Amino acid sequence: MLAMKDKPWLLLFGLLAALSCLASFGDAAYPYYGTKIGALTRLHHGVSGDVYAVDSRTIFIKKFNYDGEAPAAYFYVGNTARPSNEGAARLRDERGGTASLTRRYRNKDVTLSLPEGKTLRDIKWFSVWCDEFAVNFGDVSIPPNLDFPRPQKISALRGVHGVSSDNIVIVDAQTLLVPNFSYDGEAPDAKFWVGRGQRPTSDGLRIPDENGKENPLRRYERKTIVLTLPEDLTIFDIGHFGVWCEAFTVDFGHVRLPEGLNVPPSLKMLGISPQSKLNCEVLYDDLAFEVRWAVAGESIVVQLVAKLEPNHYMSFGISPNKNISQMIGADAVVAWVDPQTGNGFATDYFLEGKAQCSGGRGACPDTKISEKTNSIRLLNAAMVNGYSIVTYQRSLAATDRLDLPISITGAESVVWAIGPLNDYQEVSFHTFYNKHLHQIEFGRQPKWNCPLPEGARGNSNSSEQEDSAPAAQSSTGGAGYPPAGRPNVEPDEEFYENRAEALHRQPPQRRQETAIITQRRPVPTPKPVNSNGAWDIPAIQCHEPEDGVFYAQMGPTGGKHGYPAITGHVGWGISWYINGLLIPEIHVVRGKTYTFVVEGGNNPDIPAKYHPFYISDDPVGGYEHKREEEKKAVRIYAGVHRSRSGQVTPTGVGRLCNWTPDVEGPPADDYQSFGAYQRTLTLKCDAGEPGVITWKPDRNTPDTVYYHCFTHRYLGWKIHVHDSCDSEAGGLKGAASERHEIRLPAKATVAEPAPVHEDYAGEASVRHETKVSANDNFLLKHQTDLIKNHNMNGTPPKLSFEITKSSEITKLISDGIRAAEALEESLLRNPNLNPNHPNQNPIPNPHQKPNVTPTEISSRPEILLGETHAHTLNASPSASAYPSPSATLPSANLKLPILAAGPHLIHHPPHLHRLHHQPQHAPHPHVHLHHHNLTANLPALAQKTIGLSEFLRPPQNAPLFHPVKLPGRRPFPAPIKKVPASRPILPQQHPHLHPHPQQHPVLLQQQPSLIVSHYRKPIPGLLKPFVKEKPFPLQPLAASVLLLGQPTELGGLNNKGERLKIKGKPKIPVPYVDLEPQGSLQNTAIFNQPGGKGKGDQKPKASSVSISTTPIPLVKRPTVKEPSQEEIASMRPAVNQGFKPDTVIVESGFKPIVRTDGTGVQLPKEIIDQVAHRREDPGTEIDEVMETDTLFLAAQQGGSETQSFEPMFIPSPLDSTNATKVLRVNVKEVSPTASALRLPSAALEHALPSASELIKPTLDELFAEDLNEEELEMEPMPVADDVESLEETTKKDAVTTTINIPRNTTKKPDPDLLEDLFGPDEEELYADELELDMDDRVAAAAERIDTYYLPPDNRKIPDTRVPSGALYTFDGKSVVDSSLVLPPKLDAPDNANVHQRHAQYGLTPLEQLVRTTPQFGVYRGELPQEFRGTEPQPVSEYSHPAPFSRTTPVFSSSSGSTIYPYSSSTGASTSTVSSSASSPLSSSSLRPISTKLQLLKPEGRRA
């Protein structure tokens, strides 16, 4: 409690602060005047009235009456037993006068102040006394234990956004003093807020700030402010006060107001103007410089007001000479207000001289002269309508040697000045000052000698005006100011008890039955913001996540790039994070049940940490604070419980998990992508359990609903509801893991092709790895991971290469590349065919037509690698270059295969924005067969020196570390493989045949021997740091980079003997991640070839027209026997049957879509069938070729056969870093055997010291153990125990797709047979694919781009160096969760079931759901800097391989996939681990191990 005698300046401070918002004063309707003392006894001259104690020094008389006839009547107080003038004190009248009461009072409200130094505790009675006759006209006794009103202290503010203060003081019924108030000013619509009840709601009222304005609050830094309740609102009408964000219905902090507070009534309630209690004098009228003051006990409260220029000060002080206004030696206060921040300053100065302060001399602050000498207390500062207002308090007496006392008994000479501030925020020489004597009497009765503030009404001091005023209108105050507290209906005296309320006081009750008169203003809607620069937040597609579980947590809005730019609404600081993404749009399907794990806070006492989750059709949210009419228009679908009475209670309530940004990092506005910003966030969770709600949208659910917070507005975003997940509207049209193949008709009769829809634009989609790859230091040690962990699209920047000189590798590479480069340059210079070529017979051209440059089409479709296309050169837009009957050539309906990707996932590499030049073909009567994967179609770019010699320069368009194709020949038809094309497929480029008068057969052109990149991919992000700094030193890796792929054969072109030595290529195990849907070609011969060993002389299927039988010598191939006329007549018509969906093997999540509308010319059905089922060319161990260049070169020298490799993708394992490290240890246990691609260990160590540790087991070793057919059907991986454990260890996160290999293959291939050219027939491989079908589906699921935050593994022995509850996510970020603590330390790995372990350690089913369910989706940012330079620990620190017992695959009922233990596809293993397995791997988590967990392993766990 604060007694007024101790803090008398509080009321005066409130008076001065009220002047800043005087216009808000109105009429108060509630009759509260303080504690009632009693009624005056009616003795003489009609004296009557009710006496109230306003505070310890103020008495209020309600409806005072006196006839004014007595000659010497005065107001008296005394402490004697009865009223008397002996020992009594005479009071000044309501006007401050000391004259006797000579005028008449009729129901006047009179306010009187006790003499200085006296309080109500010091007196016993109050009376109207006549001195001349010593007669008491009327009196009232004052009880000794009177509980008079006084200011009350309540709690301090504490909340979010930096809201804080010291204990708030309720000065009177309408005034609050908030000392040292702070607020960060970040919210867009924060207001001071009051209302009924104990917690803020949207039904409350905003109150003006200290300047009387209702603008959103600015930043406050420990500023003491005075707030006045508006109009007739009092503290008895409200139950709380705080800071509230009105637009978002968010409580930033509040305090409760206790009931029954005994506080003084405000001056407005007593009908007193502030001017009647304050003094004011004008100092300089031109700048409206005024000084206002009031003496309060031993101190004085002063307020300076002036219209100042920016960076100017105003000063006021006491002159050392009472007779003149002298500057030198004066004690002054210098004050100013910063217009930018609104902060005010008041500094105690001693004017030692006229110069600026220097070394304690001149006009200096007291603290610059002597420490702890500042005697000024700043109370308030404001900038109102351009006026600077500063209120401060100081003692009347001098407190140190630099101060001067202020006398209240006489006049004081004062000084003042206005001038600019210097760079040190100190005074410089004044511009305006008082040049003459100016004296002020500070102890006088309040007198307002200044212009009235705006909103104030003039005084009516004339007794004639008062007397002539009607009695009904004479209830003005003593000073003539109309009272603010004028009730509409005057209560009778019986309304109050007609006795003293000292002993039985009834505190004023809140008007619960009366509504606040102030009309509620509509809640403002945040104004729209600019959506430019919004982060690209990936939507959660309808197939993600597979289990339908969403984690809803809180996090920051992301600055101007986040919530405001995404939604168009202003964010107030926090918003929902769904699966780790900032307010993503969610796609769901009707009829499917979804689960939302809510972690938004469960403490309703702290509204800023209480965010129930619910789904409705309302785009705003905040259902709890809506009006009843607004609630009726909202339909809620999930997250609430509605009782029978209609009461709605939120159910989506759980513990609080908050994504917390780095306080020391840059602000969110500095991040250009959400991925980069997300890496700075750390998930922090309170103790407790999350809330879980389920939702199943049905046919009545609208297409768009919204997820929001039940108690706050604008925290969530949209949910799109679809009927099916397969439709484009289902969110799949842009999924990175889905590709849709369609066929569009092309019109051959029109020169310009039909425009292609932009949704079908065949451009490369962005591919996102499912795991973060290793850093650059790790790449230097593992070449295999370098090649496997790269993207598959795009072209990297041109890089420099360096190869160690004077080595055998350099010489070998130089010889091979020199020949290839020379051949490439010759073909680039001479694109036209030479009719005089020695190996090419000239062909007559009776229908020669001029060449026409093909028309560029708008799309850039993907074409088929190795597919042979026929080029038809059109002479005119309307006619074909070669006449063909329309009945046999329906080219108008020609369908082109175009691979479409979603528009938001289409990637535009730089090289795709320009078309390759088409070589000028010489006119020929036949159709050109063109291979689109040749660099002959590339523009001849200027060659630049990149660190290699002329013949060692890699191809200009080849990416770094990509296998390339060297000179070689490929027969027709080539395997079809899709690669991104940089040029469109023109109608004349599609393969079809044309009739000629000479009936020439289709020529099979030899494929030019050019270096072709089989991979088009931008440089991996993990390579960028060291690639940019310096050229990457390629010492052992150069050979594998340049020579990987099909080896160069520089022998004779027609050397059939050499080609006969090519052995059949066995099938190899390839980690299945991202393969194209392909099958195996059938061994059906297209052409009858002499000497061939085909299954039968099958006749070719004519594509569209008949073929001539005229024999023409061909290059590299014997003359084929053309079909006869009878055979041609018996052929089926060339009708385009469309692409058959049943011929597609869906792999890696790709779902081709085939449009079958219309017919057209295409390849024969046999070719299409074979291509559809074509799997990767089963080459020899290409992984071993990529292992080191030494292995590759040794195989070329030691082997007698030339291995032929088809282009093939080498996908990255889902956790390749761990896989490689484990493999390096395990391979030492395998005994190597002879292989064409292996060398003795001594040779390896001589050429490459680390190569011996990089050797993988050979194929013979991998399949050294025989398995019967039953085992083959049961296990797709027929390998030995050790090898099986190796495979499981290597690929914990991906299922390995293994192609079964016959044990003994001795058949020599015949290059003229399709069977030997493309591997086994379709029937042989189709049986293998049936066994692998389950694995393929699992691989497709594991290959998805979803990446999850996984809870900690409770089965591992905890590391003492890692704090309990801390773990690392997939990208190396720490997650702090106080509830995710590890169980007691395990002595040894046990073999108990996982669920039994959970029960043993007391895990509830809800905790199991949280720990075994992914929590957020893919992360697409860049690798943080700390991991780019992190040195990986040795393999032995965290790799302890141990053999596993043979396990039985687990079949998932949801997808029908074969799942192995320790696969990421399941949350728990159902197989039993061998009890002999003692390595940590045997008890590892059922989920994939993070690649960054190596940083947490203890040093003592080395192998």
Curated annotation (Swiss-Prot):
Signal sequence region: 1-28
One Pfam family it belongs to: At5g54830
All copies of domain DM13, residue ranges:
34-143, 151-258
* GO terms classed as biological process: cell division; meiotic cell cycle; nucleus organization; spindle assembly
The terms describing its cellular component in GO are: cytoplasm; microtubule; nucleolus; nucleus; polytene chromosome; spindle
Q: Which CDD domains match?
A: DOMON_DOH
Q: Which UniProt keywords apply?
A: Cell cycle, Cell division, Chromosome, Cytoplasm, Cytoskeleton, Meiosis, Microtubule, Mitosis, Nucleus, Repeat, Signal
Q: Give the InterPro entries listed for this entry.
A: DM13_domain, DOH_DOMON, DOMON_domain, Spindle_Org/Thrombomodulin
Keyword Protein biosynthesis recorded: no
- Per its record, what are the GO molecular function terms? structural molecule activity
Location comes to: Cytoplasm, Cytoskeleton, Spindle; Nucleus, Nucleolus; Chromosome
User: What residue intervals traverse the membrane?
Assistant: none
Q: Is the keyword Cell cycle assigned to this protein?
A: yes
Q: Which residues form the DOMON domain?
A: 287-419
- Sequence ranges of Low complexity compositional bias: 830-840, 1452-1491
Q: Where is this region: Disordered?
A: 451-491, 830-857, 1086-1106, 1426-1503
> What is known about its subunit structure?
Interacts with Chro and Mgtor as part of a macromolecular complex forming the spindle matrix. Chro colocalizes with Skeletor (Skel) on the chromosomes at interphase and on spindle during metaphase.
State its role. Answer: Provides structural support to stabilize and organize the microtubule spindle during mitosis (within embryonic somatic cells) and meiosis (within spermatocytes). The role in mitosis regulation depends on the Ran pathway.
**Name assigned to this protein:** Protein Skeletor, isoforms D/E
- Taxonomic classification: Eukaryota, Metazoa, Ecdysozoa, Arthropoda, Hexapoda
